Swiss-Prot record:
Part of the augmin complex composed of 8 subunits. The complex acts on microtubules and interacts with gamma-tubulin in spindles and the phragmoplast. Interacts with AUG1. It comes from the Eukaryota. Keywords: Cell cycle, Cell division, Coiled coil, Cytoplasm, Cytoskeleton, Microtubule, Mitosis. It comes from Arabidopsis thaliana (Mouse-ear cress). Residues 107-140, 314-334, 481-504 form a coiled coil. It is found in: Cytoplasm, Cytoskeleton, Spindle; Cytoplasm, Cytoskeleton, Phragmoplast. This is AUGMIN subunit 3. Disruption phenotype: Lethal when homozygous. Signal peptide: none annotated.
Length: 617
């Protein structure tokens, strides 16, 4: 809806101003959200039937000058003042045929107002319920988020515990692997299959390589610093004072000093004052290097002594190993001798003493082997028990997580059911509101036809009679609705004519053929000779069914007659009701628009009533 629509409606309604209306000048009120619905309602409600003409305005001003306007601030007080022009109650009843119609209108208005108030209360109650449901849903959502956060925290803790357990499992597997390898090495060592003995000792080669690299770097640095630049003079002077300098260096230094003794005295004094500490540092570095060399020599001597000791220990261990091998061989021989000679004799004697026969064999070896197997099996069983406990713990954690998820799922189902109920209730309320809106629009459309147009009123009454025979309700419709009803009647008439032209002749021919067939069958039954044909008797169950069918047909015909009578009565009631409603509307309109004509009608009715009373008396 825009200003152009408003200007066009005002022009159609007969606005006669100084000039043509400009839509752009009326565009600014439509830009506000508060004023737009009111302007839309005004544009949708503007019609020629509810707009006063110049004659009506002049009549309104005349009523206002004469003081003949209705008294009251609302419609109820206007209803009360409708019969104020008459002074006698009997006269009012004679004029209006009792005031029941006005009371009915007033009661209907009060009922509609009460229903509107009840609907408003229900709407407020639904709004409060909606707010409560919104708060509950928000609380449920927050609870679900808290549960999700707690579940994530618990899952994080479970993951951390699983990681720690897996790390401990790896450590345990490593320890078990080392134990297994150690047991294999011990078994291999005790088996006596290899004669070699392995010993571990400290290796100083890495230390020697690092020390040589450090010494090389120190020598390079000192050579770079003391052989070139001003440090060279300090180094030469320091070398002259050292007793461990070689003769070649001394002779070279003396030759250099003899050549340039006087030039370098001042330079040496200056450099000695500047670089006095460099000589001491270099000497300390040399001393430290000497100490490191001494430590290195000591370590080398220790390494040689350790190697000699290891060599000596190796030779001694080999000698001891040879002695042990000899002792073991003698022990094997003694064992074989005992197993072959002494033990069988002792077993035989023991069997004779106990009256039993004991089989020969290495029982002690079997017992030791069984103990070894049992210990390994215990270790493996402990490992399996730990694995089983870990799996049980994980299973319990999964069950708890599944339980929490099922609880959350059930909670979501409850929320969904509540939301579905609320949605259905909201939809039903929306349907009722739309029905009320439609009813309000229908009520607004009842007075859409101009009251002064008698032709449209007649057409509308005819159509309402036809529609009341079908729907049973009397309504006032607008001109477009009248056109739609006329079009619908035309379509019904065309469909009935097509049925009359197409389907009815076929049905008539089919009925005629069936009647001819029945007549032929009856003729055959009636005129057949007694010698050639026997009478066909109807079975007893069929006779009972035919009697029941006859009773039902009689009841059906009675019901059809009652329905037809009710339809006729209803048509009469609807016909008189339409006349009464038309009379009421005409009286109401004349009261506001043409009260003089209403007074004349009242006088005529009074005269008619008096004449009838006189004739009856």
């Amino acid at each position: 809806m825009s200003s152009a629509r408003l200007c066009s409606l005002v022009a159609e309604l007969g606005y006669e101003g100084a000039g043509k209306l400009d839509p752009d000048s009326f565009e600014w009120p439509f830009q506000y959200d508060d004023a737009r619905p009111i302007l839309d309602w005004i544009c949708s409600s503007l019609r020629p039937s509810n707009v006063l003409s110049l004659a009506e305005l002049s009549l309104y001003e005349q009523f206002q000058r004469d003081g003949k306007l209705l008294e009251g601030d609302d419609l109820d007080q206007a209803y009360d003042s409708i019969s104020a022009f008459s002074s006698r109650r009997n006269n009012q009843e004679a004029v209006f045929g009792a005031e029941e119609s006005i009371k009915e209108v007033r009661d209907a208005t009060l009922a509609h107002k009460a229903e509107a108030l009840e609907l408003q209360r229900q709407l407020r109650r639904l709004q409060t319920q909606y707010d409560l449901l919104t708060g509950q849903s928000s609380a449920l959502i927050q609870g679900r988020r808290a549960r999700v956060a707690a579940t994530s925290a618990v899952s994080g803790q479970i993951t951390a515990i699983e990681d720690s357990l897996s790390a401990r499992n790896l450590q345990m597997n490593g320890v078990l692997g080392r134990l297994a390898s150690t047991s294999q090495e011990l078994a291999h060592y005790h088996s006596g299959e290899e004669d070699g003995i392995y010993l571990a000792y400290s290796d100083f080669h890495a230390y020697l390589a690092g020390d040589s690299a450090c010494t090389k770097e120190l020598n390079q640095w000192f050579a770079k610093q003391l052989d070139t630049g001003p440090y060279r003079l300090v180094a030469e002077e320091g070398k002259s004072k050292c007793s461990w300098v070689s003769l070649d260096d001394t002779s070279n230094m003396l030759r250099d000093l003899e050549k340039s003794q006087h030039q370098r005295v001042a330079e040496l004094q200056r450099l000695r004052s500047i670089f006095g500490t460099s000589e001491r540092q270099w000497i300390e570095a040399q001393v430290e290097n000497a100490k490191q060399q001494a430590i290195l020599l000591t370590l080398k001597s220790q390494v040689t002594s350790v190697e000699a000791h290891i060599h000596f220990d190796l030779h001694s261990l080999r000698r001891k190993h040879a002695d042990l091998v000899e002792e073991i061989s003698t022990l094997y021989q003694k064992e074989e001798k005992l197993l072959s000679e002494t033990i069988p004799e002792l077993c035989w004697e023991l069997a004779q003493l106990q009256d039993t026969y004991i089989l020969q064999g290495d029982y002690d070896l079997k017992v030791m082997r069984q103990e070894l197997y049992i210990s390994k099996q215990k270790v493996f069983i402990n490992h399996l028990v730990n694995q089983l406990a870990r799996h049980q713990f994980l299973k319990l954690a999964c069950q708890l997580e599944k339980k929490n998820m099922l609880g959350a799922f059930s909670l979501l189902k409850v929320i969904e059911s509540e939301l579905q109920g609320y949605l259905s209730a909201t939809r039903s309320r929306v349907g009722r509101c739309s029905a009320l809106i439609q009813a309000a629009s229908d009520v607004q459309e009842q007075g859409a036809v101009d009251d002064r147009d008698s032709f449209l009123h007649g057409v509308r009454d005819l159509l309402s009679i036809h529609s009341n025979t079908q729907a049973g309700l009397s309504t006032y419709v607008s001109a477009p609705a009248i056109i739609q009803q006329i079009v619908a009647l035309q379509s019904d008439l065309s469909s009935l004519q097509s049925d009359l032209e197409n389907s009815l002749p076929d049905d008539r021919n089919r009925c005629i053929n069936e009647l001819c067939t029945h007549i032929q069958n009856l003729q055959q039954l009636l005129f057949a000779s007694s010698t050639t044909a026997q009478p066909i008797l109807t079975p007893w169950p069929l006779m009972k069914e035919l009697d029941e069918m006859g009773k039902i047909n009689s009841k059906l015909s009675t019901a059809v007659e009652e329905v037809t009578l009710e339809h006729r009565n209803k048509r009469e009631i609807v016909k008189h009701h339409a006349k009464d409603v038309e009379l009421q509307r005409r009286v109401f309109v004349d009261f506001f628009c043409n009260p003089e004509r209403l007074r004349n009608q009242v006088r005529e009715l009074n005269a008619l009533v008096r004449a009838r009373q006189a004739s009856s008396s």
